[in-house]
């Protein structure tokens, strides 16, 4: 894409402001022209009225002067002509023309009055003569009529001069305004360039928030969202580095055990010892496989949940399916496994919720001794679906209850060497992604451990995930 085709805030602001200035200038010019023309026409019309009234008064005076004498109409006309010609209004570039009538007979007229001009009646009218328009005024008094005409070209010329002297300074100011607009836009967008320069200097290891103290209010929201994104990236990268480091450390032990058992099996000449070695190799491989599966699951859970994949899930049915898969493990250890469920729906993803229930029940079966009990309850509360997994095993000491949600943590009192230390961290993350909370308590008969999961319940036909509440993802210990 060419540079000119790339959207530019600066270019858009400049164009909008400059076009706005030009449109405002044209609007002011048009309004000024209209108002000035109206005012000028009124002033010129008033001049024509004053001229006509003055001419009629002079004619009346000339008639009175000759009334007591034996004067002819010709003398009256000549005296009137001399008086009218002396009026100031006739000295302005011969703009006005006039004609004097008495009882329908012409008495005198000016040389600049076209013969084809005729008044349309008393008052003002506009007529066309000699290819131009004329303003004509007819006044009547005592049998006399006077026509005063004015070529509108003179008015237009006067109007053009007035408009030129009024608007030309504004026209000269347009380039200055354009320069000020350009400077103002460039200065106003300077914070964007500063933010751009700061972001360009960032590396993959430098994900600290951008300072917002000097950021204008208009882009502070953008910077806040960018800082949130940087924080999420920093958290994700730290979690990935921590997971990689912890996984490398945790997988070293089962790999060493696998190597040892394989070497023993290879060196042993006793068939029974050889078989025992291969069995240990198989168990080590299974443990490594389980560990890797949980590491991969936890890595996927470190990303945000895809809310568009959420749908109503029957938690009671899901728990029943999980228990049917783990029944053999309970039978092998002679553990009484029971389920008490109420139908309740939660909004979520089946596979993740199944992994959550499976990890909780699997942990209970793993750490409960032979002949023990594991109880699962699914309860339908007013606003929540509650999952309870209780056992009568050794439990977890109070000072360790917060630590068991840490990745790869295994309690010294309960560790059998089989767990990966990822089960409860996976459960907690799944609960957080489903807008729920998790807590710990006493198990069956006042001993062992109870894990409580609270999830927002929904309707079977719901289509939207629940809103995140204030306690979402919080552990209640």
Curated annotation (Swiss-Prot):
Q: What InterPro entries does the database record attribute to this sequence?
A: HAMP_dom, HATPase_C_sf, His_kinase_dom, HisK_dim/P_dom, HisK_dim/P_sf, Sig_transdc_His_kin-like_C, TCS_sensor_his_kinase
Q: Which residue stretches belong to region Disordered?
A: 455-477
Upregulation: By cationic antimicrobial peptides and by Mg(2+)-limiting conditions.
According to its UniProt record, the EC number is 2.7.13.3
Q: Where is the HAMP domain?
A: 186-238
Query: Topology with regard to the membrane?
Result: Multi-pass membrane protein
- Which PROSITE patterns does the UniProt record give? HAMP, HIS_KIN
Which Gene3D superfamilies does this one have? 1.10.287.130, Histidine kinase-like ATPase, C-terminal domain
Q: What does this protein do?
A: Member of the two-component regulatory system PmrA/PmrB that plays a role in the regulation of resistance towards polymyxin B and cationic antimicrobial peptides in response to limiting concentrations of Mg(2+). Also autoregulates its own pmrAB operon under Mg(2+)-limiting conditions. May function as a membrane-associated protein kinase that phosphorylates PmrA in response to environmental signals leading to activation of specific gene promoters.
Pfam families with a match to the protein in the record: HATPase_c, HisKA
Using the UniProt record, give the first listed, main subcellular location.
membrane
Q: Which source organism does the UniProt entry give?
A: Pseudomonas aeruginosa (strain ATCC 15692 / DSM 22644 / CIP 104116 / JCM 14847 / LMG 12228 / 1C / PRS 101 / PAO1)
Transmembrane region positions? Answer: 13-33, 161-181
Keyword Transmembrane belongs to the record? yes
Q: List residues, modification Phosphohistidine.
A: 249
- State where the protein is found: Membrane
Q: Name one GO molecular function term.
A: ATP binding
An annotated GO cellular component of this protein is: plasma membrane
Q: Name one GO biological process term.
A: phosphorelay signal transduction system
The UniProt catalytic activity note for this protein reads: ATP + protein L-histidine = ADP + protein N-phospho-L-histidine
> This chain belongs to which protein, by name?
Sensor protein kinase PmrB
Segments forming domain Histidine kinase: 246-459
Q: Which UniProt keywords apply?
A: ATP-binding, Kinase, Membrane, Nucleotide-binding, Phosphoprotein, Transferase, Transmembrane, Transmembrane helix, Two-component regulatory system
Starting at the broadest rank, the lineage of the source organism is: Bacteria, Pseudomonadati, Pseudomonadota, Gammaproteobacteria, Pseudomonadales
Identify the domain of life: Bacteria
The reply to whether Transmembrane figures as a keyword in the UniProt entry is yes
